[in-house]
A protein has these predicted regions:
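Membrane-interface helix-loop junction between the first two transmembrane segments
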Residues: 18-36
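Hydrophobic transmembrane alpha-helices
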Residues: 5-16, 115, 119-218
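Alpha-helical transmembrane segments
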Residues: 2-6, 70-88, 141-153
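Membrane-interface helix termini and inter-helical loops of multi-pass transporters
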Residues: 24-27, 57-71, 101-103
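Structural signal for membrane-spanning alpha-helices in multi-pass inner-membrane proteins
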Residues: 48-55, 89-92, 133, 213-217
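Membrane-water interface of transmembrane alpha-helices
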Residues: 16-20, 87-101, 161-167
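Hydrophobic, well-structured mid-protein blocks that either form specific transmembrane helices
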Residues: 84-134
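A generic, lipid-embedded transmembrane alpha helix
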Residues: 39-59
Length: 218
């Protein structure tokens, strides 16, 4: 039953999160950019927090498909993938003032930093996180959860590109042409190159501290 319920939770989050994202242009006209961002964040968190609680409570449910936690090297690989996932995820934290609506939320179309590697870093981050935790936990519940999360983020790639194209019909096609969904593909094609100084930002220190803290808490 928990396998079905986690998919229901994920579907509910998808409807709230992606649904409100799709309604952003109309919502901002009525509530303003800050007001709608607060509504968006509050509604998303209202579903995400109990979803995470349900996941942690049931992550070992179902059939134990494999048990590799005691295999030498597995722990290091799992933590390596987890740390890498945060490096892809954290561009969303560059503008915390906007996320919390302290500053006026704005749209940022750019092809620097992690965007040179992948246009949708959050999808890559979630996929890496799912792979790492599926390897570590090894339960049928974790497999179902990971497949659901990855499927939602793949939908998010399509949905996000569609929204950007509709909102920025002139600027987005150029960004899309010069970046890639598959990590490093635009670099392989010669459309992008890594500029390491773009990664030298104070926020990365915060990510490193966060990863280390989570490691010790685990």
């Amino acid at each position: 039953m928990s396998h079905v319920l986690i998919l229901v939770w994920l579907l509910g989050f998808a409807l709230v999160h992606s649904g409100l994202a799709a309604l952003r242009p109309q919502g901002e006209k009525r509530l303003g950019a800050r007001g709608y961002r607060l509504l968006f964040a509050t509604a998303s968190l209202a579903v995400a927090v109990p979803l995470l609680g349900y996941f942690w409570k049931h992550c070992y449910d179902g059939v134990q498909l494999w048990q590799v936690q005691d295999v030498p090297g597995v722990r290091a690989w799992v933590w390596g993938l987890t740390a890498l996932s945060f490096l892809f995820l954290f561009p969303a934290t560059f503008n915390l003032g906007e996320i919390t609506a302290i500053q006026k939320p704005q749209i940022h179309l750019y092809s620097q930093g992690i965007i040179r590697i992948c246009r949708h870093p959050q999808m890559v981050a979630q996929t890496l996180w799912c792979i790492a935790h599926t390897i570590w936990i090894g339960s049928s519940f974790m497999v179902v959860t990971s497949l659901g999360l990855i499927a939602y983020h793949l939908f998010g790639v399509w949905h996000g590109d569609r929204r950007w194209a509709a909102r920025y019909p002139e600027a987005f096609p150029e960004l899309k042409a010069n970046t890639s969904i598959i990590p490093f593909w635009a670099i392989v094609q010669g459309k992008q190159k890594l500029v390491w100084r773009e990664f030298l930002r104070p926020a990365y220190v915060g990510v490193a501290v966060f990863v280390i803290a989570v490691y010790w808490l685990h």
